[in-house]
C-alpha cells in the first residue's frame, strides 16, 4: 500500500519522467497530438454528438500522467455532446504527479484552464486506492485508480466505449505493455468499443489483435510516422461470474427513485441520483432531515486506519478523499465545517505500535504525518501527553448542514414527518409504492433504503443483520484555554475545537438498549475519556456541572463485519432456494441468475464512519443503476454487498429458510 508520486525532471519547462526517461507528451505540441491520436482516432466528436439527451459515454485510459488526455476529452464532450449527456473517464496511474507538479504541467495550456482549474481544485487529496471526482456539476466523472494498471484493471467493473492506450513508450516501460493488459481491455470493452494509441510497435499491434481487436495503422502527428487504432472485433468469453455479485440488469422505465431515510446515507444517495437526472422523493419520518445519528452538532472526518490492507481501511481511504472533495464543493468553510486537521494520539503502547506501522505506509505528508509530543502540543494549541498521527486535511463538520446541502437539488422532493410503513412492488408497471397510514407517499421505479437499522423493517430486508449501538455525545462550554484548541483530538473518543462557544466530545458505545435519553452517567464517561486523552484540556473545562452540559443520543447502525451494506437487495427465500447446493459444496459454480428484489437497493450500516463512507456509497448505487464504471475495485464492491451475509450463512448452514 506504499504510495509514490512521480519523480519529474523539467526540461525547457516541460515534464519528463526521471524513472522512465521519457516525456509525458510531445515536446512539439502535446495538445495537438492528444487530439489527433486519442480524440480523432476514437471518433469522439462524432460519437459525442450522436449521444441521446440522457446518454453516457465511458472512456478508459492506461496512464493518467498530466491529465492532458482527460481534459481534452472533457473539452470536446462539452462542445459536442447534448446538454443532458454524461462523460465517465476512468484512468490508471502508478505514479501520480504531486498537486504542484500537475499545476505546473497544466499551466502550459492556458486554453484548458476552464477545465484544468476544476480538476486542480479537487486533486490535492491523493491517498492510495481509487478516487472519484465529480466535475462540471455532476456531468463529468473521473475515476482515478492509483496503482499499477495490470493490477487495477482486473478489479474494474465497467463497460468501456473508447480506450486511450497511453503510457511511456514500450521500449521505456515494457512492464505495462503486456498481453494481460490487452486482454483486460477486451474484457472491459462494450459493443463497438474503440481504441487509439500513439505507438505502432509490432508487439503492441499483435497483442491487441490476439486479444480480439481489429488493428489499423494511421499517420502519426508531427515527427511520429504511424499510430495505431481500431475496435473490438471478437469480444472474449466472459466466463463464469458469481451471479450474486453481478449487476442487476436495469429494468426501470423512468429515472425515478424513492429514498427512505433523511440522514447522510439517504441524502447522499438522493444527490448522486439527482445529478444523473433522476427524480427523487426523499422520505424522512422525523420533522426535519438529519434528526438521528446525522444530527450531532459536530462530526469528525476521522480516518482510523489499519496498517494492513483490510477492506475497511481501503474503503475509508477512498471515502475520506471523496467526502473532503464533496465538502469543499458543497459547504463554505465557516461555521459548518473546518479543515482544522485531526490528531490521532498514540495514547497507549498498542496504539503507538500501530501508528509506527501506519507511518511505514509512506502516505504523502499532505495526507498523514507523525508528530512527537512537543510538535503535537504546539500544533493543537494545548499541552498533550503524547504525540500521534496528524491528518492535515481532516477536520470537523456540522452534519445537518451537509445533509441539507446534499438534499438541496431541484430533482429532489423532500417529505418529512412521514414514515414509509409499506413498500409494494407492481411487476406489471415495474414500480414501487411507498405508503404510510394515510395512504401512498410516492411511486417510483427504484427504492433505496437508507434508514439505518430501520432498513430491516420491511419484508424484503428482514434478513439483513443490522444492529444498533447507542452513542451519547457531550456538549460543554469552552474555556479561555480550551478555545485555543486548533485541531480535532482523537483517541478512545474525540473532542473538536469549539463551535458556537461549545466543544463536542464523545461518544459512548452502549449495546442492547433502545433508550435514547441523555444521562449524566455517559456525560461522566465522555469527560473521563477526555481526561485520559488530554488531561490539561480537561482540567481547563471548569463549567462541567450537569446544568452546564448538553448532549444528545442516537443509534449508530452497523453490521457484523463493520462494513456498510451498499447495493442491490435480493429476494431472500428465492436466493436460498436458488443456491441451496452451496451448503453442500461451496466450490460449485451455479449458473442460475440471482433472484433480485427488483429495483430495491440498500445504503446502510455506516456505523460511526458515516461522514467517510456514506457520500461515496451514494455514488456506488448511482453507478450500479446507471450502468456506469464502479467507483471502487470489485473486491471492495463485494465486501459491501448486501447479500454477503446471506451467502455466508447459506454456505455455513446457518440459515433457517422458514425464518426468512
Swiss-Prot record:
Its cofactor is FAD. Residues 260-660 are annotated as: FAD-dependent cmnm(5)s(2)U34 oxidoreductase. It catalyses: 5-aminomethyl-2-thiouridine(34) in tRNA + S-adenosyl-L-methionine = 5-methylaminomethyl-2-thiouridine(34) in tRNA + S-adenosyl-L-homocysteine + H(+). One of its GO terms (biological process) is methylation. It comes from the Bacteria. GO terms for cellular component: cytoplasm. One of its GO terms (molecular function) is tRNA (5-methylaminomethyl-2-thiouridylate)(34)-methyltransferase activity. Catalyzes the last two steps in the biosynthesis of 5-methylaminomethyl-2-thiouridine (mnm(5)s(2)U) at the wobble position (U34) in tRNA. Catalyzes the FAD-dependent demodification of cmnm(5)s(2)U34 to nm(5)s(2)U34, followed by the transfer of a methyl group from S-adenosyl-L-methionine to nm(5)s(2)U34, to form mnm(5)s(2)U34. This is tRNA 5-methylaminomethyl-2-thiouridine biosynthesis bifunctional protein MnmC. It comes from Chromobacterium violaceum (strain ATCC 12472 / DSM 30191 / JCM 1249 / CCUG 213 / NBRC 12614 / NCIMB 9131 / NCTC 9757 / MK).
Amino acid at each position: 500500500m506504499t504510495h509514490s508520486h512521480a519523480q519529474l525532471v523539467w526540461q525547457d519547462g516541460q515534464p519528463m519522467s526521471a524513472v522512465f526517461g521519457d516525456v509525458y507528451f510531445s515536446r512539439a505540441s502535446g495538445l495537438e497530438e492528444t487530439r489527433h491520436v486519442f480524440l480523432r482516432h476514437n471518433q469522439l466528436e462524432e460519437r459525442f454528438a450522436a449521444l441521446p439527451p440522457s446518454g453516457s459515454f465511458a472512456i478508459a485510459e492506461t496512464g493518467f500522467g498530466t491529465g492532458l488526455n482527460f481534459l481534452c476529452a472533457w473539452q470536446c464532450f462539452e462542445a459536442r455532446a447534448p446538454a443532458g449527456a454524461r462523460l465517465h473517464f476512468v484512468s490508471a496511474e502508478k505514479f501520480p504527479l504531486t498537486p504542484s507538479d500537475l499545476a505546473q504541467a497544466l499551466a502550459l495550456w492556458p486554453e484548458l484552464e476552464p477545465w484544468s482549474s476544476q480538476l486542480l481544485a479537487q486533486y490535492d487529496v491523493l491517498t492510495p486506492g481509487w478516487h472519484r471526482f465529480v466535475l462540471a456539476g455532476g456531468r463529468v466523472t473521473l475515476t482515478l485508480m492509483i496503482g499499477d494498471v495490470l493490477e487495477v484493471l482486473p478489479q474494474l467493473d465497467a463497460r468501456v466505449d473508447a480506450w486511450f492506450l497511453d503510457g511511456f513508450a514500450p521500449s521505456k516501460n515494457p512492464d505495462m505493455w503486456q498481453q494481460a493488459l490487452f486482454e483486460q481491455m477486451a474484457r472491459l470493452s462494450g459493443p463497438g468499443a474503440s481504441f487509439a494509441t500513439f505507438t505502432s510497435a509490432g508487439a503492441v499491434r499483435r497483442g491487441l489483435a490476439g486479444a480480439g481487436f481489429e488493428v489499423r495503422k494511421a499517420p502519426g502527428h508531427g515527427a511520429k510516422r504511424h499510430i495505431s487504432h481500431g475496435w473490438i472485433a471478437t469480444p472474449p468469453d466472459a466466463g463464469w461470474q458469481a451471479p450474486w455479485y453481478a449487476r442487476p440488469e436495469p429494468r426501470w422505465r423512468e429515472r425515478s427513485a424513492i429514498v427512505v431515510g433523511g440522514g447522510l446515507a439517504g441524502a447522499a444517495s438522493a444527490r448522486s441520483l439527482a445529478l444523473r437526472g433522476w427524480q427523487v422523493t426523499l422520505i424522512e419520518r422525523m420533522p426535519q432531515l438529519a434528526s438521528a445519528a446525522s444530527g450531532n452538532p459536530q462530526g469528525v472526518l476521522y480516518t482510523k486506519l489499519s496498517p494492513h490492507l483490510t477492506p475497511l481501511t481501503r474503503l475509508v481511504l477512498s471515502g475520506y478523499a471523496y467526502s473532503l472533495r464533496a465538502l469543499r464543493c458543497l459547504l463554505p468553510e465557516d461555521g459548518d465545517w473546518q479543515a482544522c486537521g485531526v490528531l490521532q494520539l498514540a495514547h497507549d503502547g498498542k496504539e503507538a505500535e500501530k501508528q509506527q506501522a501506519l507511518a511505514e505506509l509512506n502516505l504523502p505528508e499532505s495526507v498523514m504525518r507523525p508528530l512527537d509530543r512537543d510538535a503535537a502540543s504546539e500544533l493543537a494549541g494545548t499541552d498533550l501527553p503524547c504525540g500521534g498521527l496528524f491528518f492535515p486535511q481532516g477536520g470537523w463538520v456540522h452534519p445537518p448542514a451537509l445533509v441539507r446541502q446534499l438534499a438541496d437539488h431541484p430533482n429532489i422532493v423532500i417529505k418529512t414527518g412521514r414514515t414509509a410503513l409499506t413498500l409494494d412492488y407492481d411487476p406489471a408497471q415495474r414500480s414501487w409504492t411507498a405508503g404510510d397510514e394515510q395512504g401512498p407517499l410516492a411511486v417510483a421505479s427504484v427504492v433505496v433504503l437508507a434508514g439505518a437499522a430501520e432498513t430491516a423493517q420491511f419484508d424484503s430486508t428482514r434478513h439483513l443483520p443490522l444492529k444498533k449501538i447507542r452513542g451519547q455525545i457531550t456538549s460543554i462550554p469552552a474555556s479561555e484555554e480550551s478555545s485555543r484548541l486548533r485541531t480535532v483530538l482523537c483517541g478512545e473518543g474525540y473532542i473538536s475545537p469549539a463551535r458556537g462557544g461549545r466543544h463536542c466530545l464523545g461518544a459512548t458505545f452502549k449495546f442492547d438498549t433502545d433508550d435514547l435519553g441523555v444521562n449524566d452517567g455517559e456525560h461522566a464517561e465522555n469527560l473521563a475519556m477526555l481526561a485520559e486523552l488530554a488531561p490539561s484540556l480537561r482540567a481547563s473545562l471548569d463549567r462541567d456541572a450537569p446544568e452546564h452540559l448538553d448532549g444528545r443520543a442516537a443509534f449508530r447502525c452497523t453490521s457484523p463485519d463493520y462494513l456498510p451494506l451498499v447495493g442491490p437487495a435480493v429476494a431472500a427465500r428465492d436466493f436460498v432456494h436458488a443456491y441451496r447446493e452451496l451448503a453442500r459444496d461451496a466450490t460449485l459454480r451455479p449458473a442460475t441468475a440471482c433472484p433480485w428484489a427488483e429495483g430495491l437497493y440498500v445504503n446502510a450500516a455506516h456505523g460511526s464512519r458515516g461522514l467517510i463512507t456514506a457520500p461515496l456509497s451514494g455514488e456506488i448505487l448511482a453507478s450500479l443503476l446507471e450502468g456506469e464504471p464502479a467507483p471502487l475495485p470489485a473486491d471492495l464492491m463485494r465486501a459491501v454487498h448486501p447479500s454477503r451475509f446471506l451467502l455466508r450463512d447459506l454456505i455455513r448452514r446457518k440459515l433457517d429458510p422458514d425464518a426468512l
